[in-house]
Amino acid sequence: MLVVDDDEVIRQLIAVNLTLEGFDVATAVDGQDCLDKVTAIDPDVITLDIMMPRLDGWMTASLLRRNPDTSTIKVVLITARAQEDDKKRGRQIGVDAYLTKPFDPGEMIRVVRALAAREPADQTAEDTAEGRPEQA
C-alpha cells in the first residue's frame, strides 16, 4: 500500500487509518516520490492526490498505467477536485476509484480493501462507482 499526498496531515490520516486496518503502508510526498518508490515497494494499491508539486496525480496515474511493471497496480484518487470533468478524466486514465475530500475514512478503507482483494468496490459509493473505467 502506498499513500501519496503532499499534505502531511492528510497523508498521515490515510496511512494511520490503513495501518490500523492491517495494511502495510508506505508514503510518498508527491508523484515523483511515488514513481521513485513504487518498484521497490510493489504495492497492490496506491492512494493518490491530484494537486501536488513536481508531478501531479494525473501524470503520475498516467505513467503508472503506461509502465508494464506498474500498470496493474490499483489506483484510488483521493482529491478535493469533485467536478464531473475530473471524474471523467480519472476514468479515461484508468484509475480504479475516485474519492473526493473530505472523505469518509470507513469508505476509503472499504474501497482499498476491495481493490486489494481484486474484488469490485462497493457500488453504493457514488464517487467510487463513477471512478471506474467503463467496460467496453
Segments (PLM) and residue ranges:
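Charged docking surfaces used in two-component/phosphorelay signaling
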Residues: Q12-L20
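Receiver (REC) domain active-site loop signature in two-component systems and cognate sites
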Residues: M52
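C-terminal output helix
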Residues: F103-R113
